[in-house]
């Protein structure tokens, strides 16, 4: 499957660098700081080993042994077999399903957008959950009080993501 997500343009800030590091650890199996440094360099982010080490500490990244014995960096609390890059679709769906099953009241695609309605006050939480997951073709979200707009890279991606969100939200 080809990733239709355009490369993100990131400002040269510490916050953007931390975000790029976290996203790399969520979407790939990263086994060394030099590998992570190269991933960041490919995105136009130059970082020293000392800075990278401090950044990994700051985002609470840890080295975890995966089921196949590989030692890789991970962020957040993850079980030994559950590095997100090992099975991104199942892991993403499971995490999102827990939240969306009780909070999504309707979903619709409109061009390259997916409009998600929630109960009053829940939209920002739903958007945050979507933003934290590596979902192919999703560029980001905007949330109000009871509505989330999911911005997709293309119209057909929005249609697929709308159906996927509806399916995931329907699981109880």
Curated annotation (Swiss-Prot):
Keywords for this protein: Amino-acid biosynthesis, Arginine biosynthesis, Cytoplasm, DNA-binding, Repressor, Transcription, Transcription regulation
Annotated GO MF terms: arginine binding; DNA binding; DNA-binding transcription factor activity
Record flagged with keyword Transmembrane helix: no
Subcellular location: Cytoplasm
Coiled coil (UniProt feature): none
Domain of life where this protein originates: Bacteria
GO biological process: L-arginine biosynthetic process; protein complex oligomerization; regulation of arginine biosynthetic process
Any Pfam family the entry gives: Arg_repressor_C
UniProt cross-references to InterPro entries, sorted A to Z: Arg_repress (IPR001669), Arg_repress_C (IPR020899), Arg_repress_C_sf (IPR036251), Arg_repress_DNA-bd (IPR020900), WH-like_DNA-bd_sf (IPR036388), WH_DNA-bd_sf (IPR036390)
Pathways per UniProt: Amino-acid biosynthesis; L-arginine biosynthesis [regulation]
This protein's GO CC annotations: cytoplasm
Family statement: Belongs to the ArgR family.
Function: Regulates arginine biosynthesis genes.
Name listed for the protein in its UniProt record: Arginine repressor
UniProt gene name: argR
